[in-house]
Curated annotation (Swiss-Prot):
Coiled coil: none
Biased composition (Acidic residues): 36-62, 71-83, 98-110, 141-153, 164-177, 196-212, 268-285
Source organism of the structure: Kluyveromyces lactis (strain ATCC 8585 / CBS 2359 / DSM 70799 / NBRC 1267 / NRRL Y-1140 / WM37) (Yeast)
Protein name, as recorded: Transcription elongation factor SPT6
Segments of skewed composition (Basic and acidic residues): 1-21, 154-163
Amino acid sequence: MSDKEDEKQSQPVLKDDKQDQTEEPAIDDNVNGDEGPSDEEEGDDVFDSSEEDEDLDNDEEEAQKVREGFIVDDDEEGGEEDEVVKKKSRRKRRAREEENEALDEDDLDLLMENAGFKRPSASEAAKQRSGKLKRLKRVGDDEEESASAEPESEVARTNKLDDFFSEEEEEEELEDDGTGRAPSRKGVEKTVTLADDMDDFIEEDEFSDEDEEARKFRIAEKKRIKEQRLAQPTQITGLSPDKVDEMFEVFGDGHDYDWALELENEEELDRLEESSENEQDENELGIDSKRKKKLTLQDIYDLQDLKKNLLTEEDMNIRKADIPERYQELRTGLKNYGKLSPEDLELEKNWISDKIAVDKNFDADYDTTEFKEAIGNAINFIQQENLEVSFIYAYRRNYISSRSKDGFVLIEDDLWDIVFYDTEFHSIIYKRDYVKTFYEKLDIHDPIVDEYFSNQSMTELNSLQDIYDYVEFKYAQEINDVLLSTQQDATSKKHLKNSSYEKFKASALYQAINDTGITAEQVGENISAEHQLHPVVDHPSLKPTDSVANILEGPEAKDLQIFSQNPKLALETIEKYYALELSKNPKVRQKIRDDFYKYYIVDVALTSKGRKEIQRGSPYEDIKYALGRTPAHFRSEPDVFLRMLEAESLHLMNIQIHVSSQDQYTNHLFQTSLETSNTSEIASEWNSFRRDAFDSALNKVFSDVSQEIKDELKKTCLRLVTKSVRHQFMFKLDQAPFIPNPKDPKIPRVLTITCGQGKFGSDAIIAVYLNRKTEFVRDYKIVENPFDRKEPELFENALDDIIQHCQPNVIGINGPNPSTQRLYKKIQEIVQKKQIVDNRGSHVPVIYVEDEVAVRYQSSERAAQEFPSKPTLVKYCIALGRYIHSPLLEYANLTNEELLSLSIHSHQSLLTRELFLQALETSFVDIVNLVGIEVNKATDNHYYAKALRYIAGFGRRKSADFLESLQRLNEPLLARQQLITHDILTKTIFMNSAAFLYISWNEKNQRYEDLEHDQLDGTRIHPEDYHLATKVAADALEFDPDAIAEKEEQGTMSEFIELLREDPDRRTKLESLNLEAYAEELEKNTGQRKLNNLNTIVLELLEGFEELRNDFHPLHGDEVFKSLTGESEKTFFKGCIIPVRVERFRHNDIYGVTNSGVECVINAQRHIGAQLKRPAEEVYEIGKTYPAKVIYIDYDNISCEVSLLEHDIRRQYVPIHYSKDPSIWNVEQEMKDQEIEKKLALEEARAKRTHRVINHPYYGNFTGPQAEDYLRSRERGDFVIRQSSRGDDHLAITWKLDKDLFQHVDILEKDKENPLALGKTLIVEDQKYHDLDQIIVEYLQNKVRLLNEITSNEKFKKGTKKEVIKFIEDYSKVNPNRSVYYFSFNYEHPGWFYLMFKINAQSQLYVWNVKLTHTGFFLVNYNYPTVIQLCNGFKTLLKSSSRNKTQDNNNNNSGGYYGY
């Protein structure tokens, strides 16, 4: 495997999202200065080298190559076959072209035989072809044939798209086909229009060097030829002229690209004339110079346009491949798909069985042998035979279900899961094989890795990642060697991964790990076995510190000078890398992973933002205090975990995944793997060392496994929500057309009505009539007001006239607002009053129709193209009528963007776009294949053909290819066998789709004796079962075996089907058959399990393609309410508070309306007017909006009763639909937070109270930020006294230290006479004062004086911390042997100063903190009255600390001296 073939895999990186918090200015309560701000930072790894840092960017590419197998290649490799193209006379046409994916002769014979068809002989086939229009020629066919012509199968083989590039003369297309048929004038007219439109796509003069006159002449000639074509009539057998016209309009006539071909012909002729002599010479030398690059769509159109229309090279390959299109898309990027070893196939069966079994909820003692067999069969059908879900479920059901009647059946949901799991398994196997190859290249033998690859049950990607990380960690040097040996460049880069560990392992310190008494590999085996297979052996004489001391004093310690003065750092380093070895050990990780997956629970930890923002009505309300949630909880409510993840991404909460009693679990693992029972001091210290390393390692593994579980749980929950969305959408699709009379199941004539905005009298009412063929006939505009009290009969008569003229079987209605409900009731009243009945004498039903499709259609591009001159409401009504005829087709004609906008499931927003569309597509596939597609109807009905893409085996590309192939037939399809004989479908696609593509039986077709027209072509019976169906029919008719055998020899078994269809007692005869016994006999003789197929045969012989969908579902009750108002149970419920606009008054009652149009009634007892004994109109105003509480909802009349009383509005009722069981809800934390919220609410109330007024010249009515704004333009030392947010017993002083630097000082008041009075005792920083003036003089003015003293000192430097550090560093470089120190403001903590210093140029920069008090400067537990004393004290401290601590190990860390 070359490096280019291996795909790169990025290692997973865990990131800690930190929430940025903005806080209000804080009151400085730190009096003693013992809580100084810290700038401590973590030091660099002692084994990181500058050499690695310099090469980091360069080496990253090489390091990445090692991991590149962990993402499957997205680009499929494939070669392009060169086609041999030969010129032939323009007066001749090729006899026939063969497709790349066409069946060979043996396959064709076998398939035709299994399907019950008789394949025509070569002469018969030639005769058939002679009566048809010839196919369009390819560009390459214009080249001359050589003397020694190659076989036709090699020369004529080409892509179906080549038919677009025909160079044949236009007159040839008008040739008669022997039956007198020629293209219709109208159809050609439309085709020419399409061609003209395509001509505008690229301007002609950009591709031509001819002069203007020649160009005009050529265009005129082209136009003349087109006009000749328009003058000739056309008729296509079996299709009406209108249908032919529609077909031409949709598909064109194949001449859309003539302009490009004419251009190429002209250029090629010129080129051939100029080079004829050279070609002759080259031909004499045996060189074929006539080969030329064939013009392709890529040469004509922009790539983006080709992608949009699915015409790229990849798209064409998908069209040609004999694999279902959905499978091809799903398997994109998978190498060597379907080439698993027998062991891997068995492994896949068990792996998928375990996953599907969870959904089946089998009992613990259930025998899964038969279940696994069914899973294996399904995998074989999907992977080896490329059969789609719909086919498997319909015609292989006995292979995927239990033999017991009450046993399991793998339903469509399970089969779709198997399809996706199969792809995932192949990806895992590919990655496993990559890691194995990678490991073998290293030429090493590691017991852990060898054991993993010998264990055929290991299929989890996480375990595989452990092995890969382990090899990369432990054998970094070997990887480097392999990389170096495979690099041609002598200056190849190093393998960077774990290079610091390699340096540690090569150092003398590694000996200390050997002294621990047990290796990481032995620990892994102990943990895996759950007891000490390898006992720990303590060092007999040395403690950990002694072992390190010996190493540092030994002869190999010359490279360990950094540790010579700091043995503690050396011990910490050893512990760190020992913990790393433990955390990388696959057995340690696998044991913890197994235990975690069995026992993990999920808790939620709120952030301060989440505690504040998640309130009643929030989408995360039910998970705010989630606790102890198990996998079972998430399987029953998968949206819960997805919403947890969503809330975590918004920084509202953190998800914590752990096992219960995790500390005890860690103790248990340590005791069984690393702890010794010795009680000596040496053993205790080694136990302590090992325990610290073990805890560190397990914390890392816990974190990694928690993240793995989070990712796996997310994947599972997404799958379950996707399945739930799929079920909801299938409910919408699984509706038959509306049938008013079930006894006479005819598609109804439909009249649809809408009132638009519902302004009766000013806005017209629109009605649209559609016939039984779903064709728009005409629209009506009713201007009469249906609620006109003076002349109500005007509207009634107008509507009655329309109904009498159209004779509809059903009236459908809907609209955008609740006014539609009034119209609905009015129409029902008119139907009853006028006795408007159908041909059965029943009243014409008036129904509410779901309008979510109509709303999207009315303003769509499709509607504009179909009805460009019609108003929006007419288009809306047309879509309502189409929905009544077929909800399935209405949804199938929506674009992806329109489908994405549908509201299907309450949690669909949790899914990605891809998963949501996947759910919808699988729903379409299941229902469309349940219903089937009439082939000939699809060829001339673009609206109907939209569902073709969902037929088993098809997709967007193959359905388009299928329609193009049918178009080239130029006649209706008469039998399913023609799908094979005419090379329309390839073998696998035919097997998948044939039974779902039906051809209506027509006795007229019997005149074609060259085809075996079978009545079974109009049933759901698969062609492979035709022979079985004839035998069932013969048995039902009770023919004797000899007669059946005779018919079978004569090949006329289909006569039994005709006889049975004509038999009036066929139902009784078919139902009397013992199908179970027949199926058992069939399985015994042939090994085929066909019981389900036999049941299908019986049902289809009774009625072909019987309607299996659920009845049409008109809207009722709350569904109508939701459709007309847009309200749901979450936005409009009993007890909710809504805004109501007053419309009118009546008898002291108030009538209003909500924003969504719901009419509201407020009776006299539910508004304040009754209490005040005043009329409602004196208290409330018309047009004004008031808050109201919903008391009762009348869904039928789209109205409600509400209350305007204040005490009702204050008590809003929000229903709780979740459990607060203490086992899954953190009740204790909720109560604590509620107490905090109460205190905060009280403080906010205090803050909003009447502002205190203190009689003092410096007191101002400010908040903290307002005080800062006030002082911003004033001088240093200025201040204000203000009210404190801490309550009535606090005041605050805000004073200015420097530009944009302010300190807020808290004043606590004692001995208050009342809450608003000033306290007699005032406390600031534990110092008591008797009034504000004393605080100003003794406290504040002293601080201002000391502030001016330090800022005027030469050792004070203005600027930010970074600016001062840069100044000190620069100074130290210029004066390397001098110490330097400076003070500067601490802008993060007003009232504090930084003291930053360096001993010399080589030392680290240290940062201490100094606090400004009213008596001096506080540094390291001592207060210095002046700056001079502060500087002297600093130097004294520095000298004393230097004697005690000469080496500091923290970069830029004040902790090196006195912990600052």
